[in-house]
Amino acid sequence: MIETTFAAAMYARDLADRGALSEFATELRAAGVRVGGLIQEVLRDDDGKMTGIDMVALDTGQRIAINRPTKENLENKTCSLDTSALTDSTEALRRAIREGVDIIVLEKFGEQEQKGQGLNDEILAAIAEEIPLLIAVPEFALALWQERSGALGDTLAYDLDAFRPWRGTVQHG
């Protein structure tokens, strides 16, 4: 592993429990680390069916509803991402960069970011500012992530046991 200020936490598309990033951010905050960024929270009904996705700002707890699929979206498996809500979520990353947090944890390198949209500008700004960044990247998009990041960042397993030692190698500033 080369020493860099950013890393992709690579996960398989079928990974059922993606709580490791949220748990890592909670651990860091408990240790007094200033954490910025966003985590996705999948909302489910009583039967376990997805009813939406919220982005949660790690510094404020603000919830931003980025996805509320209709019955038709679910039946036709069409995208129901609210791109204006996604745009609203960029403020959490801009704030983290502006405030110079100790680390940014981000659970978002989805379709919009893969197209160079969504949170892409803020992700690249965090890297340029050398703020440690841990970002969830789906396995199928890893090559694109590496291309966009100049293949300079680390690639980690999506696991606390991979995040912790990486964190020990990076410092902001």
Q: For each predicted feature, which ranges?
A:
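Glycine-rich, charge-decorated loop segments at or immediately adjacent to ligand/cofactor-binding or catalytic sites
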Residues: E139-G153
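Short Gly/Thr/Asp-enriched flexible loops that form oxyanion-binding sites at enzyme active sites
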Residues: Q114-L124
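A charged, well-structured terminal subsegment
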Residues: A157-G173
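Glycine-rich P-loop/Walker A and Walker A-like loops and their local beta1-loop-alpha1 context
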Residues: M1-R29, V33-V35
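Helix-adjacent hinge/juxtasegments
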Residues: L58-E99
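Substrate-engagement module of ASCE P-loop NTPases
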Residues: I123-E139
